[in-house]
Amino acid sequence: PTLLEFGSPTCGHCRAAQPLLASALGAHTGIRHIKIADASGRPLGRSFKVNLWPTLVFLRNGHEIARLVRPDNTTSIADALAKIDIAE
């Protein structure tokens, strides 16, 4: 299971989401978390149809299971993580 986090170091919403992500990921140690520094015109972000930052894409076996755009609470992140965590 993998969490792709598309964002930018200069994005205020991205910085605000960091404590929420850290809290939610604490219970899911088997999930790989990959931060992707995105920018206008970057092909990887476009291939995942990312329009706003942060966008979290939750993958299991290479397939998108869930997506959150600008998450603002730990519960929504934890719920999406539970959907991809094979340990649960």
Predicted features by range, described:
Residues 12-13, 40-43, 75:
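Short alpha-helical
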Residues 1-9:
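Short active-site neighborhood of thiol/selenol oxidoreductases, capturing the structured segment around
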Residues 11-14, 56:
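The canonical Cys-X-X-Cys-His
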Residues 6, 25, 29-43:
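Thiol-based oxidoreductase modules, predominantly thioredoxin-like and allied folds used
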Residues 13-27:
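Typically the conserved alpha-helix immediately C-terminal to a functionally engaged Cys/Sec
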Residues 47-51:
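A short glycine-leucine-enriched loop at secondary-structure breakpoints
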Residues 52, 57-88:
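Non-catalytic, surface beta->alpha helical segment in thiol-disulfide oxidoreductase systems
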